[in-house]
Amino acid sequence: MASKVTDAIVWYQKKEFLSVATTAPGPQQVLPGYCQCSLKDQGLFIQCLIGAYDQQIWEKSVEQREIKFIKLGLRNKPKKTAHVKPDLIDVDLVRGSAFAKAKPESPWTSLTRKGIVRVVFFPFFFRWWLQVTSKVIFFWLLVLYLLQVAAIVLFCSTSSPHSIPLTEVIGPIWLMLLLGTVHCQIVSTRTPKPPLSTGGKRRRKLRKAAHLEVHREGDGSSTTDNTQEGAVQNHGTSTSHSVGTVFRDLWHAAFFLSGSKKAKNSIDKSTETDNGYVSLDGKKTVKSGEDGIQNHEPQCETIRPEETAWNTGTLRNGPSKDTQRTITNVSDEVSSEEGPETGYSLRRHVDRTSEGVLRNRKSHHYKKHYPNEDAPKSGTSCSSRCSSSRQDSESARPESETEDVLWEDLLHCAECHSSCTSETDVENHQINPCVKKEYRDDPFHQSHLPWLHSSHPGLEKISAIVWEGNDCKKADMSVLEISGMIMNRVNSHIPGIGYQIFGNAVSLILGLTPFVFRLSQATDLEQLTAHSASELYVIAFGSNEDVIVLSMVIISFVVRVSLVWIFFFLLCVAERTYKQRLLFAKLFGHLTSARRARKSEVPHFRLKKVQNIKMWLSLRSYLKRRGPQRSVDVIVSSAFLLTISVVFICCAQLLHVHEIFLDCHYNWELVIWCISLTLFLLRFVTLGSETSKKYSNTSILLTEQINLYLKMEKKPNKKEELTLVNNVLKLATKLLKELDSPFRLYGLTMNPLLYNITQVVILSAVSGVISDLLGFNLKLWKIKS
């Protein structure tokens, strides 16, 4: 065997491709042709080695042909222009994966490590925290961090005897690490990369990159956006800072930086707005865009919405020198304060303005020399009309109205694209290569929304019934208009504050738990009334005259209440999101019911045509993906894992020392955590199960099939058409049953095997505790099954 391996390695180093042999595989024919890997990957090499013994002559012949095809590629293949059929649907559309959400590029292990490091060394990562949070929240977290450090120092430095347990002081540290990890995973989709260099060299390099890209685009070259990023990332290494420099920069950033929402404009992806909904145009509002370029220097030149010159007239009359000067100044200011990623995002916005200037100037040049050609003119007017209408709709709207931004942008872009496609199809490709860049970057021209890219994008309409008071009217409505009305109804719903009040109460209870624990350990309930107020004060705070102990207790109380409140506030946000998902599902189910549609003030239509079924499936998948998805799932999964850990520790403590279980301070807190988290998880499971049940309700399709048979009876002449629709409804019912899955909490429960293992472990632990307390053997997992 050793000789075979040696010969295989020699053969592997000398031979490039495997030749077809007619004899049995020998020592020098052990590697298959598809494994052209380096010797560094030992696992793959051994896989190739042992796989060679399974091969036959036909497989080697096939591999030889595959290698030949790989060498030639598609260059010699005859190719014709083809187009994807936009009027057909894919299984991704029905499943919902066609409406993709932003995902982090790093694995969860790396994000967890980064979150822990950024919490432990909080002051040294102040720029990152300023970019992913607001300035007020950053100062609040900084104060809590310093107070926690002070509490640990006071606990270690005190010499007088006291009754303060160590868990009371270090307990908030674990919660701080958990919150930091959760926040790092939430913002991981558009967290700016750390700057690789500082100082004037970076500013000069960014300024040079900005000028270079503007001149290249003016010459018509197809430079990508990675030019600036590569210029920044290839420059030098990060310089080391002393502790004094860090705190001096922290003090400087505290009073001069506006770090409210810088990170949300750093990467050119679909941004997630304040209420959690995705804005597909790549930017939230004009206000958030301006926040990203604010600077403390008074002579900084920024670009306001009215100065950005989106309309055609301003683009035609704007001087190129002023445009390049503004681009240079903005790039300089951004690079000096926000790092390369944020400056890169802003320069993309500015470069597109310059791109429009150069494109219109080139259009004017073509029109001067070729007055009979209308293609450049139509292309320029189309892009200008689309961008100016979108800019006008955003400039006169507050930042909070994100849903109107979404739907108006969708409709504006759809109308502009449908009105200009027939005029500027070939000419724009030949004359304006910059338009191709905008076409590629435009999220409306990507493949995430296939039902928007038909011959009339976003304008495929179905006949729907709407109510105006007591009058019943019929109107042709598109998917965007129907979903917009559903969105308006969901946004107008007033959420309850019951769980928020419950979270506030739990925060206060967990903060007062150490005081109650010391009182219960010092005196009995009968003797509690016999003590004076001063004696109870001394017992609750653990000391009478020691200022260090009193300060430590007060600091621990403030930090504990604040961190617990933040965690339960995030759970309340997740509960509100789950409630909105349930409202989406309810209103979607009301579309095909006349009585419920009138009561809910949403349109009503029947699935009497194949086109209606297609729109119904598209609308169903789209509404399922609306709102926050991954960010809320991170919060829920963290609560789920925390609950499992708390329940496991409580069960272990009860099995080990159940007689003195309440004699430990941390056991009191674990019981309160277990009860409160269980209530929230039950709420999440209830809302999620109801939402899945609403979307998986096939009774709607069965009812529509009955309606088709009733219509066949009244109109026998349309029997063939109605039979076709009935068959499509049957196929849709089978497809939904195959694709839909029951609701499960995000995290480990998504894997059925791990879900069952976790379920058995928890139920086994609880069964052991109950059996030990009651005196007889009880197996809960058998009862549940």
Swiss-Prot record:
**Compositional bias (Basic residues) spans?**
200-209, 359-369
Q: Does the keyword Transmembrane helix apply?
A: yes
Q: Which residues are glycosylated?
A: 329, 697, 756
> Where are stretches of biased composition, namely Basic and acidic residues?
210-219, 391-400
- List the biased-composition ranges (Low complexity): 378-390
Which residues lie within the region annotated Disordered? 190-239, 304-401
What protein name is recorded for this chain?
Protein PHTF2
